[in-house]
Amino acid sequence: MQKIVLATGNPGKVRELANLLADFGLDVVAQTELGVESAEETGLTFIENAILKARHAAQTTGLPAIADDSGLAVDALGGAPGIYSARYAGTDASDQENLEKLLAALQNVPEEKRGAQFHCVLVYMRHAEDPTPLVFHGQWPGVIAHQPAGAAGFGYDPIFYVPALGKTAAELTREEKHAVSHRGQALKLMLDALRDA
């Protein structure tokens, strides 16, 4: 079994990615378990931030690293909150505070203009000096609901409505979510590439 460090401090992402990766026989260790501090996210895109995080974890641990950078892009807000999704309402904002700020920003936006996409970029870095890290992008289209619904998931899941399923992301089972989510898509692309390598 190959040990890989997961370069994130977000407990929701750790749970979700560790569960998915364990299904494929990968020994995933969260960077927090190895005493690795979070990398500073100074990039302007999901790709830049994911590469920064993966390289930092690989340099600190000497292990291959997987990093995720993801967020919500809302059409009516010009793609915001985007790379600032986790800190939309402030640096130490809770999921609930971020969600409330987003709903307030969309208060007068009609249903047909509430389109949004979750984006996930996964980076697999074989070692800290890897000149060609593997980069995978998953995108999940939906609509921002007017009110939260559901208790599963994390972040914006309670207001991310998936018309094709008739539910918010927070109303989906783990299996349903992984089959269609941005993170599930990016992970499938990554695992397919690793199998073929």
Curated annotation (Swiss-Prot):
Catalytic site positions: D69
Taxonomic superkingdom: Bacteria
Pfam families assigned: Ham1p_like
SUPFAM superfamilies given in the database record: ITPase-like
Residues reported to bind Mg(2+): E40, D69
Binding site for substrate: T8, G9, N10, P11, G12, K13, S70, F154, G155, Y156, D157, K177, H182, R183
UniProt EC number: 3.6.1.66
Alphabetized UniProt keyword annotations: Hydrolase, Magnesium, Metal-binding, Nucleotide metabolism, Nucleotide-binding
The UniProt record lists the keyword Coiled coil: no
This protein's GO CC annotations: cytosol
Broadest EC class assigned to this enzyme: hydrolase
InterPro entries, per database record: dITP/XTP_pyrophosphatase, ITPase-like_fam, RdgB/HAM1
Catalyses which reaction(s): XTP + H2O = XMP + diphosphate + H(+); dITP + H2O = dIMP + diphosphate + H(+); ITP + H2O = IMP + diphosphate + H(+)
Cofactor binding note from Swiss-Prot or TrEMBL: Binds 1 Mg(2+) ion per subunit.
Cofactor(s) demanded: Mg(2+)
Biological processes, Gene Ontology terms: nucleotide metabolic process; purine nucleoside triphosphate catabolic process
An annotated Gene Ontology molecular function: ITP diphosphatase activity
Gene3D superfamilies: 3.90.950.10
Family to which the UniProt record says this protein belongs: Belongs to the HAM1 NTPase family.
Family annotation (PANTHER family): INOSINE TRIPHOSPHATE PYROPHOSPHATASE, INOSINE TRIPHOSPHATE PYROPHOSPHATASE/HAM1 PROTEIN
Subunit architecture: Homodimer.
Function recorded in the entry: Pyrophosphatase that catalyzes the hydrolysis of nucleoside triphosphates to their monophosphate derivatives, with a high preference for the non-canonical purine nucleotides XTP (xanthosine triphosphate), dITP (deoxyinosine triphosphate) and ITP. Seems to function as a house-cleaning enzyme that removes non-canonical purine nucleotides from the nucleotide pool, thus preventing their incorporation into DNA/RNA and avoiding chromosomal lesions.
Name this protein carries in UniProt: dITP/XTP pyrophosphatase
